[in-house]
Every structure is written in structure tokens, then in C-alpha cells.
């Protein structure tokens, strides 16, 4: 039986995600972001709610990406997630994409020319952002056209790069429904962006998300729930460059801007430049919020939930890797657990995220 790995955020889970799980083969393992996501923002609902939505709609196992993997640029996000899925026994990597490309060939090219491609990046002007440099690299070595690029396309290339040299079959699945950033409500499959924007429209949410009651009943947050905390950190700390990925230039820009803004989006708009993209600034604000440091990644894999079929696979994997099913006095990953405690500050109804929590168990459906 195939073991298919899927990297996801499910922010929140919607019918496009359900379609992807339906198209994937065999046992399906999801490596999912925790309470903070790749583009640098708090997840709309907590990791346990999102994991349960996935398990009720086709996933067999959901494991958590550590904070330092989940809140990263595309390449680091993809590499960390693919490494975890490989250790979990995945032989196939399924992912959504808008483009009809031969990702296996792209992975082969990167495996053969990784050194040259990395050296090429070093020759590019520092005024370019890292995503712009990466696009130029792919254009030069593979001829890919980025004129209509989208986040899923960028991530798909990052997955191909991360899978180079690994025994992984790549299974790209064409995205269905609304575009990634679409805020439209009249689409057959609404995007996560649209669902977050219109979360107060109960009828729309019921139409757009499977297991929608889980989403509607869970405490919901966004960046504005944490703005005062971010402002406090920026104003009260004399130096910010001890925080992960914060240099003196960005620290100065943040300290200058924070006294003039009244929201996270205003702050991001004031601080971002061609070099410091909005996504990068949001990630930096997330690092400041949780006081992140550069740390080693945890050895164990934290399991958020599983089905009966998933449980059988986990029993086999316990012989070769460390499976963390319950977090007690000894931390799984201190940085992730600190981030979770801060996430709880965004809403008084968010439950404890780690201590005493056991994996969600879903009985066989249908």
C-alpha cells in the first residue's frame, strides 16, 4: 500500500483540501503547521480543531510541524516538512499546484545541479528578495515561466527541491475551485483566504467547509488579537536583533514604524520593502511575538491524531523513530510549546494546547 505524505496548513480546512486527500493514494499522512502558519500569522483556529477536520475528511495521520519549520520561507518550510514525512515512511508526496509541470524532472535537475543553482543565487543582486532570487534560479535552469505564479506553484517547486535525492514519488494534484488568494464567495470551492475573510457569515462557512461545525464552534483569532503584544515587545526591548532572523536594519524599521500604526497590517505596510516582503515581515513579527531563537529541531514527531489505519502505521514506525503522543513534564519542542502558550493569549476560550492532550482518535468512517 502506498504511503502518501501531504504538507498542509488547513487554515482552515475546506473542500479543496478534501479533494486533495481524495486524490491521494493509500495511507495519508499530513504534516500540518501548528498554531502559527508559513506566511507568518496565527492560524484562525487551533491545531487540534484543524487536525480533527482533516481526520474526519480523509487523513489517516496528522503530525505537527515544529514552529521553526512551520513559520519559514517556502524552501525551509518544504524541506523541514518533507524530511518529517520521509521519516514517517512516506513513499509518495502529494501536493496541490496550479501549473502542469513535470515536478519529478525538476527534482532531478535540482539533484544534478544543486551546487550550480546555489552558486547562481549568490550572484544575484541583494536588492532582490529571496523569493525573487529563487524565481530567477528556476527560470534560468528549468525555463519555468513565472508570469502567472501563485503561492501553490512556489511551494510545489520547493517540494520538488526538497524531495531531490529522496526515494519519493511526486504526485502533483491540480488545484480545484477558487485561486489561493481569492476572496470571492461565489466559487464552487472557496479558498481559505475567502473563508477567513467571511468567517462571520455562517451560511457561507457551512457551504464552504466540511466538518464546518468544528470550525464555527472553535475560538477564532487573527493577527489583531496579538497586535498589543507585538507592540509591547517592540517598544519595551532595547535590542531586537537577538530574535530569530531580526537584523539591525529591520529592527530599526520596526521601532520607527510602531509608534505610527494601529494594526498589524499598517505595520507590515510601513516596514515592507522590495527586499523585505510582506510575508517575511509577518514572519519576523511572529518571531518577535514568541521571542523565537534559532534552535535545533526536535528529534521526535508529535502526533495530533490518527484513524484506525493510521494507528497501525504508527505502531510500525515506533520501531524506527521517536513518536510523541503525549507531552508531559519533558517538552517535545520548547519553542513550539512557548508559541502555543502565546497563541492561547489571543482568546480566553482557547484550551491548553499541549500538556495532558492526547492524539485525536477517529473510528473508521463509513
UniProtKB/Swiss-Prot annotation:
UniProt keyword list: ATP-binding, Cytoplasm, Ligase, Nucleotide-binding, RNA-binding, tRNA processing, tRNA-binding
A Pfam family that the UniProt record links to this protein: HIGH_NTase1
EC number: 6.3.4.-
Cell location: Cytoplasm
A single GO BP: tRNA modification
Reactions mediated catalytically: cytidine(34) in elongator tRNA(Met) + acetate + ATP = N(4)-acetylcytidine(34) in elongator tRNA(Met) + AMP + diphosphate
Cell membrane among keywords: no
GO annotation, cellular component aspect: cytoplasm
Chain residues that bind ATP: 7-20, 96, 152, 175
Molecular functions (GO terms): ATP binding; ligase activity, forming carbon-nitrogen bonds; tRNA binding
SUPFAM superfamilies: Nucleotidylyl transferase (SSF52374)
Lineage: superkingdom: Bacteria
Family the entry assigns: Belongs to the TmcAL family.
Record PANTHER family: TRNA(MET) CYTIDINE ACETATE LIGASE (PTHR37825:SF1)
Functional description taken from the UniProt entry: Catalyzes the formation of N(4)-acetylcytidine (ac(4)C) at the wobble position of elongator tRNA(Met), using acetate and ATP as substrates. First activates an acetate ion to form acetyladenylate (Ac-AMP) and then transfers the acetyl group to tRNA to form ac(4)C34.
Protein name: tRNA(Met) cytidine acetate ligase
Organism: Streptococcus uberis (strain ATCC BAA-854 / 0140J)
Amino acid at each position: 500500500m502506498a504511503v502518501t505524505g501531504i504538507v498542509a496548513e488547513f487554515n482552515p480546512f475546506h473542500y479543496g483540501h478534501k479533494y486533495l486527500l481524495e486524490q491521494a493514494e493509500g495511507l495519508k499522512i499530513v504534516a500540518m503547521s501548528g498554531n502559527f502558519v508559513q506566511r507568518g500569522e496565527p492560524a484562525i483556529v487551533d491545531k487540534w480543531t484543524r487536525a480533527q477536520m482533516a481526520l474526519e475528511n480523509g487523513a489517516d495521520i496528522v503530525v505537527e510541524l515544529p514552529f521553526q519549520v512551520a513559520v519559514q520561507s517556502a524552501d525551509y518550510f518544504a524541506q523541514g516538512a518533507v524530511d518529517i514525512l520521509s521519516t514517517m515512511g512516506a513513499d509518495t508526496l502529494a501536493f496541490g499546484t496550479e501549473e502542469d509541470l513535470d515536478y519529478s524532472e525538476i527534482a532531478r535537475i535540482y539533484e544534478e545541479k544543486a551546487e550550480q543553482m546555489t552558486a547562481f543565487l549568490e550572484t544575484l543582486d541583494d536588492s532582490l528578495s529571496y523569493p525573487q532570487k529563487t524565481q530567477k534560479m528556476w527560470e534560468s535552469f528549468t525555463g519555468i515561466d513565472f508570469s502567472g505564479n501563485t503561492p501553490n506553484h512556489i511551494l510545489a517547486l520547493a517540494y520538488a527541491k526538497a524531495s531531490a535525492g529522496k526515494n519519493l514519488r511526486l504526485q502533483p494534484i491540480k488545484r480545484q475551485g477558487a485561486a489561493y488568494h481569492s476572496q470571492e464567495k461565489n466559487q464552487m470551492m472557496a479558498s481559505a483566504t475567502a473563508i477567513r475573510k467571511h468567517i462571520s457569515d455562517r451560511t457561507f462557512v457551512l457551504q464552504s467547509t466540511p466538518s464546518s461545525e468544528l470550525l464555527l464552534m472553535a475560538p477564532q483569532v487573527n493577527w489583531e488579537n496579538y497586535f498589543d503584544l507585538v507592540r509591547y515587545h517592540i517598544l519595551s526591548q532595547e535590542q531586537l536583533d537577538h530574535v530569530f532572523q531580526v537584523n539591525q536594519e529591520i529592527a530599526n524599521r520596526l521601532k520607527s514604524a510602531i509608534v505610527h500604526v494601529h494594526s498589524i497590517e499598517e505595520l507590515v505596510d510601513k516596514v515592507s520593502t522590495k527586499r523585505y516582503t510582506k510575508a517575511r515581515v509577518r514572519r519576523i513579527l511572529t518571531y518577535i511575538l514568541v521571542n523565537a531563537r534559532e534552535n535545533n529541531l526536535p528529534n521526535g514527531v508529535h502526533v495530533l491524531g490518527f484513524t484506525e489505519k493510521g494507528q497501525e502505521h504508527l505502531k510500525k514506525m515506533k520501531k524506527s523513530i521517536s513518536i510523541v503522543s503525549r507531552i508531559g513534564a519533558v517538552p517535545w519542542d520548547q519553542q513550539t510549546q512557548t508559541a502555543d502558550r502565546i497563541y492561547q493569549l489571543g482568546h480566553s476560550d482557547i484550551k491548553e494546547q499541549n500538556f495532558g492532550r492526547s492524539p485525536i482518535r477517529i473510528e473508521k468512517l463509513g
